Amino acid sequence: MCERGFARRREEVTGLNRITEKGLKDICKRDKLYQTPRLNDVLYLHFQGYQCIENLDEYTELKSLWLESNAISEIQNLTKLTKLKCLYLQNNLITKMENLEFNRELDTLNLSQNHIRKIENIGTDILPVLNTLNITSNYLTDSASLAALVECKTLSVLDLSNNRIDDILIVKIFEQMPSLKVLVLQGNPVVSRLPQYRKTLILACKELTYLDSRPVFPRDRACAEAWKREGYEGERKEVQRWNRAERRKTRESVNSTIRMRNRHLKPEDQVPLLTSSDSEEEQKGISSAEKAQKRAEMEYGSVDTMWDEVSGESQASEHSTTSSTSAEDNESAGSQADHIAERISNRRVKPLEGRPKVLYDEAASGDEKAVTTTDSKKDSNAEDLPELKDITEALLQSDTASKPPLQPTLLQSDSGSEMDNTADLEQTCQTLLQVAQGNDDGDPTPKQIKSQMIDEMYESFGSDLFEEHPLPIDQLLNESTKKYQLEAKVCCEEETTKTPRDLYKEFIEEVTWRPKSKEQLEREQECVDASEKCAHDLAEMGSHLEEDLQELRDFTENLSSDVQEQAKDPSESDEEPTEEEMEVKSQLLKEQFQDRKKRLKEAIEERKTMQKNLEARKEDLNKSYNLFAKIMDDATDNVPKRVFGAGCDVPSKDWDKEECMQQLPLTSMEDSINGRPSSNDEDILTRPLTELTSAEAAEEICSQLDRKLAGEEEALRQLLCDLENENEILYSIETQIKYAESISVEDSQSQMVCASLLNDLISDVIYKDITEMGPNSYPLGPIESDEEYTYSEEPKLEKMVPPHLENPAGGKSLRECVDTFKEFFASKGNDKPRQESHTHLEKIRAAKALLKSKSLAEFSKDTPESLDAQLAKDEDRRKRHVAASAGRCFAKREKYDDTLEVVDNRLMVVKKDTGELEELPPPPELISDSESEKEVEEDDDAYDTAEETLQEYPRVPWTTPYKPKPRKAAEHLVNEAMQRVLAEQFSELPDDTKENEPQEDEFFSLEAKETFGNLDSEFFQKLDLDKVTTANNAEAATECMRSYNELKACMKSGSTELQLTSEENEMLQEMLSSNEDLEAKHKSNDDPLVERDNELLNKMMQRMKEHEERARELQEQLEKEKEEENSGPIKLSMGEGSMLYQRWSPLSLTEIIDPQAEEGGRQAEEGGAQQEEGGAQSEEGDDQAGVPQAEEGVTQGEESVLQEEETHAENGVAQAEGRVLQSPVIYPIIGYEDIDDDDAASDFTTDYSSDDEVAVVVPPKISPAMLKAYYYDGFEEDMRMVRENEARTRRGLRAIMQKEKQMWKDNEEEMAADMAPSASPKEEHIPEVKSETETAKPTVETAKDKWAKIASRLNEFLDPEAMEQLESHEFGESDGEDDVDLTGLQNYDEESETECESALKETTEIGDSEKQENKTQDETLDPKDTEAITDEWSPYQTSFEENRTAFCDRHNKLTMITEQTSDVGDPETETTKLICQWEKIIPEDSKIGDGPTEKFLDQKAQDNTENTDERPENPKNFITLDYFVDTEPSESLEDTEATETPEVSTEQTLKTEQMEFNLDVLNDDGDVVIKEVTVEAQVTYQ
């Protein structure tokens, strides 16, 4: 490994690089390789300046790795590259070959130009398939540095060039490389030092095909081998032979062509064939070759030509080269001469003097065998006989010419020699001729004789081989005969190194059928004599074979030195038939055999005596060995080495031979077999004292214990087996029973709970759509408590919910459980979250219906450029307005009482006066998102993309029907009250409060933007022109809600009493003391705002006292009630005092209340908040009777205030603007509820409107004890207060209606000057408690009725451009800006003004139609709907029924008043219509013709960039658009068409045109995507 310090120094000095994972991926990317390391099989890391190999473990599939031209000094970190085949490491700094053990598939290794001094670690055991090694330009010097190449058995390509090798011994290393084919040694000193460098290496490397820069051809190898055999002369001959062969090949090719031509020519015209150009040289070469052949044959005993002479075929010499007369004969003669030269050159010759014999012995013997085999094969072929005769003739003629004195000697017969026996010679010649001619019927051939002799030898002594042996045949074969085959061969070969049999074999194998010369015949005679002697010796040896065999059996172990010689014995014994045969032929051989037999006998006698001596010595050794064994036995207490057999446990000295054989090794066993048993063993070895040895006793004890333990173990195993079987049976039964029980119990419980939950939830969702509740507001029925039915045990059902919703109630509060179930049902939907498909469908249908118009042609006049310019202008104006609003809000941030700080990664509320920390209202999941949005919105540039982080919960517009201002509201109300009581102390606060309004918009609108925004709400607000000018009417409810939040903020968690500061307590006492004075003053004052503030203040004071008393009384009962709550089932409903904050549209209340009731509007805010304990029928009362149905938790005073508030809201919401600054100090009241503007139940899972797009009031943080007190104990008292409020409300209705007329006039004057874009549809949020069961009741009107009214009224007030702008925003999507919903209302051109003027003329007719709609609305809410209360409220059903009558009476009165005012045509008429209907409320003013609408629209467009919180007075004309939820698609369209038919037929005409809309859609990344949608819709125009 690279040392870090060394690597760091090197990097500092030379700037070397390291192999990093990122760098490797970059290189792969550059070379277009895979980014996944294991997918690459090649990697190029050359020329990178790397200093070590590292970080390659992930490249496990590499087959080729290039690391050349780096600075690598060590081969390392290649253990994971097990499939590497090629490794290139040239041009590096490597000094040692190592660490390649794991690369066993390496085939090519290049280490050239490194610093290696020794080849190592590349043997076949390490790199078994290494084929190529390039190690040029290193520091290799001698054979020691190359010694490891001997181990490379598979290396075939070796490049050692340009090293420093100078040792000629490397040739021996190359000889031991069997696969070496390519060798490069150039550039080394050894090339010049090695004599005959190229020939030597070619001879040393048998498989070499390429040396240095040239190939090794077969001719080169043949010349080198000739040079090795015969020196330079042999090499010259070999070269000539190759040249002749090449010339002959060419000549034969030409002659064959000539012959083909001569076939078609006449004899005189034939072309002569080509003759050999070197025939004379060939003749000389033939003569010299003959002489060399004679010398060689005479020296090595070859008698081929002698036999030819003896056969008398010398007359065949007539055929010679000179006798051929034609060119063809000459050519054939030349060819024969070539063949003769080739054969002569291949025959064995005597090595030349001066050459080392060691290098050539092996090659010469090999050549000899090859030549002999070739000659024998040729001689055995009868077809070659004439040619051989010609050759022999030539040889004999040359021989007789050169040596004439020897010729007569060949025919002389020596009387004392074998030559006198002419009959024998004739018989021999006849036999040889028959064999040569292929006659197999004659005498047997030498091979047949040989096989016959071998068979007879085995027959002669095989039967008597084991006669006298005392041992059994099996034992003898297994033990002694093993070595007998190798050792039992006795002969006297010591005297002669070459036996006669060997000579005879040579004679048989080398015999040829050529005529023999005299020298050959003489040599043959000598061989025959030797053969006779050998046969005689063999016969004599066979007679003593039995004795020799007996000696071998006795002394087998002593014959190891003679084993190899004895192996020749069977082949010698087969000479017996030959002996007899030879005796018949030659008397001389018989005499020689007799002499030889005598000598053999003498030798055998000597061997016997020697054997006896050896036997005697062996007996002495045996005795000493036995004595030593006894001593060892005594020393070891006679414990045997091994116990074996039955009854053989005796001391080792008493073991019998069989046991000894099994105990001893093979040699000792043979000694025991061959040894003579001593008769006095017992005398030599004294027996032990006792027969029972310690080993025997120990063995007996051990055997007994073993048997006993074996029995016990067997019994125990059986017992355990039985127990296991029984346990398995019991376990299987028990498992089945438990499994069945668990399945049944779990299924029964889980299925029951899930079925009930799902049924309730699904029924509520379906009922919600019918009753026009907001989408995503899922009221839940009664749900069993977590204690009774826990969700920890997973039901055996198919999982229908996401993993994070599988345990909805585990460790969660009631609110979190509700949130979880709501997410569950949202996830069950097939469409996007927070949206319902049927709502989309109905909106599209309604849009098509209401956009059917004849004036669509006007839209086609607009070009894309003009529309784009207009849109850009609107967007720029909106951005400027938003930036200004944000800047003002940020500038006033220091004037708040409370601030927000991040504490422990959470956003906390810091009280300015006390410094206490409060958590933001739950749920925590949404708070963090809200605060993050708040930080984003503080940046001016963030307004365009504010909706990007709100993909799950769409943002709602800033300009919304209601903007709660909790912090500023509390401050404002307190300051107003203190101003009236102590004017000199609080005179400067109203201005500040007004300046701070925008900041509070931003502060408290964020949470609402986290709610589940509804598509319809934004759509309605875009169409609601009434809300543009009447937004300030909601100020009364807003102010009261702020005070309510301020009051709740004072109640810290865990306290049962109000925690007020001293200043607040003093202020409260002053308010209480001056309560009656203020009330009288306000009664005398004609200003409705002052009177309303006073009433609200009185209600707040009264409510404060009631809360304090209730808290003290119920403090003792908190623990008991807590236990009851825990033991009872958890009700996921809103009935028992759960505080949900829902916004109600102020106009939805004013439609059915007399205008005089406004004075009680502010009081209704504080009173409505007390309805949290009950409220099951509050919404029903609101829809049917004009005021919320009283609940047991609401006092009568609150009810009266609520009614007055509704009546006041009916007469004009905008009149609240002028009175906001004079509101008295009103403290928050616990139990307030934020009311939805769509008359639907709020989303109880989030504490803010489920579908409205404005920020909700922050819910109070009240201690659980205080909540329990409100839940359980304020019910009866609240019921009494409800009845009192009802009475007071009736008395105050008349006065309020009278005051409303005056207020309308006042607001009318302020409207023109104060119209602002911020006065977009705003809704007064009257707090009222709504239970869960209440949310499921029918609301004011179904969705189909709303859509019908929309279709019939919308086109009367909007010109086509305004309608297009209206549709340019996607439903329910908002970018979170103040005036985003007014983009369609801010830019009116002349056409829009004309349309509005024409629309104003239809006021009277519309008023009549609205009267009819009011009647229809009242009919839609039948008293029967009140029966839809869930079982949760059954205990209070009676009290509710009692209150219902009173409310219905009041509702009837209010309805009568409304109808009267509508008939008269007063300006208040238009504000009495239900907000759920699409209405046009236009007072019958004489100034309409003068263009008040144009002024109003111009003023609104100018104020678009100003503060959105400037509230204009009551407008003269406005269109009210309220939120609704459509019903099922099957109902909606039909009802819509049915509803709009009568109105359209009397007032409008329909025209179908095509309109394009730009919809702002949030994609998955949170970015705003503008989609252009074309819709064909039916728009109604005047």
Curated annotation (Swiss-Prot):
* Alphabetical UniProt keywords: Cell projection, Cilium, Leucine-rich repeat, Repeat
Q: Which GO terms describe its cellular component?
A: axoneme
The record's GO molecular-function terms, alphabetically, read: dynein complex binding
Residues forming the LRRCT domain are 189-227
- UniProt lists compositionally biased (Low complexity) regions at 313-327, 1166-1178
Spans of the LRR repeats are 38-60, 61-82, 83-104, 105-126, 129-150, 154-175
Per UniProt, the ranges with Acidic residues bias are 572-582, 928-942, 1529-1540
**Ranges of Basic and acidic residues composition bias in the record:** 339-392, 1078-1092, 1103-1125, 1321-1335, 1398-1427, 1484-1514
Q: Name its cellular compartments.
A: Cell projection, Cilium
What residue range is the signal peptide? none
Composition bias, Polar residues: 409-420
Could you give a single Gene Ontology term from the biological process aspect? axoneme assembly
The keyword Transmembrane is assigned to this record: no
Report residue spans for region: Disordered. 245-420, 560-587, 859-878, 913-942, 1073-1092, 1101-1137, 1150-1218, 1305-1345, 1358-1438, 1484-1517, 1529-1548
Tell me the protein family, please: Belongs to the DNAAF1 family.
Q: What does this protein do?
A: Cilium-specific protein required for cilia structures.
Q: What is this protein called?
A: Dynein axonemal assembly factor 1 homolog
